[in-house]
Every structure is written in C-alpha cells, then in structure tokens.
From Swiss-Prot:
GO molecular function, one term: ATP binding
Name the record gives this protein: Histidine--tRNA ligase
Similarity comment: family membership: Belongs to the class-II aminoacyl-tRNA synthetase family.
Keyword ATP-binding (UniProt): yes
GO cellular component: cytoplasm
Reactions catalysed according to its record: tRNA(His) + L-histidine + ATP = L-histidyl-tRNA(His) + AMP + diphosphate + H(+)
The protein's assembly and partners: Homodimer.
GO biological process, one term: histidyl-tRNA aminoacylation
InterPro entries per record: aa-tRNA-synth_II, aa-tRNA-synth_II/BPL/LPL, Anticodon-bd, Anticodon-bd_dom_sf, His-tRNA-ligase, HisRS-like_core, HisRS/HisZ, HisRS_anticodon
Subcellular localization(s) per the UniProt record: Cytoplasm
One Pfam family, short name: tRNA-synt_His
C-alpha cells in the first residue's frame, strides 16, 4: 500500500523549510523589539475553549473544527486558531497577577487545524504567527499591533499593503446595532441563505461575514455599525484613527468587516494584499482586533486583550508570487573526500574537527569514487575540500583546496586535528 499525506496537509521539505525558518526568524526579531515573548500551548484543547471563545454560531465551530471524544470521554478539539489557547494559558497560569508587567505580551508560531476545502494558500493543517497583549485598554496598543504587523511585512520586502479597520464598539453599541440589523434583515428573511437565516436568530452580525452571493446585496446595504457606536466607543475609534494618521499609515474604514470569530469588540483590522497566487481581488493575510471580554469568558478576571494572526502558507505563497528574494543559507564550509575504505577513520576525525571549530562540514559515507565526491562538494557549495587517501595517511598530511581561488596546499594532518579553525583561517580567510 502506498501511503499519502492526508488531504489538506503538506510536507515542508528541506528546500522549502529554509524559507519558513527565515520568515519565522524575522517575525521573532520584530516581536522582540516590541517586548513580546514566545508562548507555546497544546495543539489540542477542551472543545469548550473554542466554542465559548469563537462563538457556537461561528463557521469555525459549526463547520470547521476537528473534534472528537478521547478515551476518557473528554470532548477534545484540535486548535483552529491560536488566541483561545493563549487566553486559557493566561488564565490558568495567573499571568494577570501583580508580579507580571502589563501589558503582558506574547507571540506564538505553530500549526492550526480546520476542516475546509483545500485551495491555494488554505489548508486543513495550516500554520499561524500570532501575537496577544493582555491587560492594557489603551487604544495605542491596538495601533501598536497593527504597526508591528506592517513592520514585519515590510521587513520581508512587501509593499502596497491595504489596511482595513472597523470598530465593533462596546456592549451597548453592539446591542443597539444588533437590533437595527435584525430590523433591517427580517423583511428579507426568505431571500437569505440557509446559514444566514440561522445566524439571524443567534448572532445577526455573522450575516455580515457571509460569502454567499444571495446575502451580498443585503450586506452591502446594511446599516453601518459606526452609526450605533456609543459616544465613548466612537471616541475610542477616533483615537485609533488619529494615531494611524499620525504614523502615516494608509488605511480604509470598512464598516461591514466583523471578522470570523465572536470574541472581538472595539477595534478590528485586516491587512490585505492583491496577488495572483491568492485568487482575485484583495486577500487577507493578517487579521485581528481587541477582545475585552474573552479572558473573563474563559474564567479569568476582566482583563482586556488585543492581537492578530498571520497565515504562514498564504504569506509564503505571496512572497514567491511577488518575486521577493529571500536570503539563502551559505553552503558547506568543508567537504572531506576520502579515497578508499582505509581512510574512513581519518575522514571521520577530520569532519569532526571541522565541526568542533564551528564550521559546516560533511563527508562521503558511501565509499564513492573521488570524482563523485568532488561533484557533491561542488553541488553543496563547499568552500574547501579536504582530500585524504592512502598516501596522505602514510605521509601524515591532508590535501587542502580552496574552491573559490583554486589554491591547493598540503597541510599536516596533526595540525588539522589539533586546531582546524586556525588552519581554515590561515588558508581561507587570510588567503
């Protein structure tokens, strides 16, 4: 039987993993400058963590989650997004305590799981980079996470990004808007999609998130939530826009944007880009916002939070589509060519000495002919080849060749084994 990877998953092979490592490394560097530290949470959590946080009417919970009963009859779900697990960890470990600085800033990088139709940039197992900041209600933190995302994308070489912002207001704002939306949609009930009919009863804001063509005309003409913000919520949103303006960030206000998860309130945002690899029109590559009630919903104190998530698959597709050239790792420093089985021990000692000196080194393990070994050394971009055969062993020497200059020299084997770094520096770095 020939086994294949599950549908909607991918093998990230060594030729591609280098790109992933670079992108993740840039994220870590950027986040560090903003005071964020890494957090790692389980790949699976209690089902209730996600149903309570994402909302039991959201597509994530009703259609996309991988959930099951384990052998202890516990209802478990593979994480479909990162925020809920981080909030659970924040509450369980009492990271809101007075001994911790506020805002408490963390980031995560890892796989998520959603059962949806696989397509370009969208898999059933996908990877996400995300940040969360807890304990500060200041709208400046909202703007900070937006600017941090933009700084990350620009560091990778992306430009012409579109930022969309909206406010979902406070609890009173949403209650007022909820009723206005129900009053607007009720007369069109029979014309809505089946999903939107159900959403209208349970969470009418979800209708605005519908991608069904039957709902689009009603979404476009729906009342704006911005007209229902309380004075305090409107003032807060004005502060966010003022700070974005002061930083020269190009943005648009999208009053129909609600995001796909129920825990957001006040500021929400998306960073979008237009690229062939991700379909027609603008595609979201980063989304997030504020969630002032989520910590309390999961059993903690009334602590505000704000964050975002970035899809790694989509981002890496985009980088390739835009022709962004990412740095590549250097090849080998040293390749040891051993001629004949009798050189096995000395080849091993030489490659070990090179690695002990902090160099990237490799050798032949297949007892191939010298020509094949030199071909491998060239393919791997080796800066130096060391050749050791029966004659070199008898003479106590090693044939040392600098590939870039063609310089060749015979070096005492004992010197290489005693201090390979010194020999390498003498013949390569000093010419």
């Amino acid at each position: 039987m020939r086994y294949q990877r599950p549908k909607g998953t991918a093998d990230i092979l060594p030729g591609d993993s280098q790109t992933w490592q670079y992108v993740e490394g840039q994220a870590r560097q950027i986040f560090k400058t903003y005071g964020y530290q890494e957090i790692r949470t389980p790949l699976f959590e209690s089902y209730d963590i996600f149903s309570r946080s994402a909302g039991d009417t959201s597509d994530v919970v009703t259609k996309e989650m991988y959930d099951f009963k384990d052998k202890g009859d516990r209802h478990i779900a593979l994480r479909p997004e990162g925020t809920a697990g981080v909030v659970r960890a924040f509450v369980e470990n009492k990271l809101y305590g007075p001994e911790f600085n506020k805002p408490y800033k963390v980031y995560y990088i890892g796989p998520m799981f959603r059962y949806e139709r696989p397509q370009s940039g969208r898999q059933r197992e996908f990877h996400q980079i995300g940040v969360e900041a807890f304990g500060a209600d200041n709208p400046a933190v909202d703007v900070e996470v937006i600017t941090m995302a933009l700084r990350f994308f620009k560091k990778l070489g992306l430009s012409d990004l579109r930022v969309a912002v909206n406010s979902l207001g406070d609890q009173e704002s949403r209650a007022n808007y909820r009723q206005a939306l129900i009053d607007y949609l009720k007369p069109h009930y029979d014309e809505l999609s089946e999903d939107s009919k159900e959403r209208l009863e349970k969470n009418p804001l979800r209708v605005l998130d519908s991608k069904d063509e039957r709902d689009q005309q009603f979404v476009e003409n729906a009342p704006s939530i911005l007209d229902y913000l309380t004075p305090a919520a409107a003032e807060r949103f004005d502060q966010v826009k003022e700070m974005l303006d002061s930083l020269g960030i190009d943005y648009v206000v999208d009053a129909t944007m609600v995001r796909g998860l129920d825990y957001y309130n006040h500021t929400i945002f998306e960073v979008m880009v237009k690229a062939k690899s991700l379909g027609h029109g603008y595609t979201t590559i980063c989304g997030g916002g504020r969630y002032s009630g989520l910590v309390e919903e999961l059993g903690g104190p009334d602590e505000p939070g704000v964050g975002f998530g970035i899809g790694l698959e989509r981002l890496i597709l985009l980088l390739g589509d835009e022709g962004v050239e990412l740095p590549t790792e250097d090849g080998l420093d040293v390749y040891v060519v051993g001629i004949g089985e009798a050189t096995n021990l000395e080849s091993f000692r030489l490659v070990t000495a090179a690695r002990d000196a902090g160099l990237v080194a490799e050798r032949d393990y297949l007892n191939r002919k010298p020509k094949a070994q030199f071909k491998t050394a060239a393919k791997e971009g080796a800066k130096v080849t060391l050749t050791v055969g029966q004659r070199e062993i008898e003479e106590g020497t090693v044939h040392f060749k600098v590939m870039a200059t063609g310089k060749e020299v015979s070096v005492p084997l004992a010197d290489c084994l005693a201090d390979f770094g010194k020999v390498y520096q003498e013949h390569v770095e000093e010419g």
